[in-house]
Amino acid sequence: PAPVFAEPRQGSLANGEIGAYYRSNGNAMGGNVSATFATESISIAYAGATAESDNYQAGRDFKTSPVTGREGHSLPLDEVGSTAYKSRNHELGIAFKGGAHLVEAKVGYQEIPYQLWPNQRMDMLDNGQQRLNLRYRGVFGWGTLEARAWREDVEHFMDFGADKRFWYGPDSGGPAAPNGMPCAPASAT
């Protein structure tokens, strides 16, 4: 969103918001907070949010076995595996306004320790993102000049979450795994 500034001769402006939610299915919970302080020429804003959930439950049993293929790991018959997630997002912005000129900088950070997908082969087991956005906007007699520069770094790790296994073909594990090895396609060697 665009930065907010106080009106002329208003002095300063401060506002904020806080929110939270809880959903029993999956024990999902989250919250958000935002705050802004501004004068006629400077605006400082922060926004942050967090969300997390365990696997959610279906309306009734839809599987015939609790086996996941991972030794020692099972799921209830009504639990939809690989639907858990956890995320945190933060953004801090500062803007300066003088006459017909605006300079704005925003830094953001996102952390997702895990996001599991029931319809995908692999899960995201770690994700980190940092971003920096710079913006200038100036109105001149000949027109408007707007310039932006940004940098974004993302690093993530994909692998199989606890509800998935590497091999799903014949002899791929479960209660009838050959040699007792849940991920063995054929044998221990």
Residue positions per predicted region:
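Active-site beta-strand termini and strand-to-loop segments that position acidic
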Residues: 2-3, 37, 138
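Active-site/binding-pocket entry motifs
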Residues: 4-7, 52, 152-153
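A beta-strand signature from Gram-negative outer-membrane beta-barrel systems
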Residues: 1-19
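Periplasmic-side early beta-strands and strand-to-turn transitions of outer-membrane beta-barrels
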Residues: 13-19, 23, 27-30, 34-127
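Short polar/acidic secondary-structure junctions
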Residues: 6, 23-25, 139
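Outer-membrane beta-barrel domain signature, strongest for Gram-negative TonB-dependent receptors
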Residues: 76-189
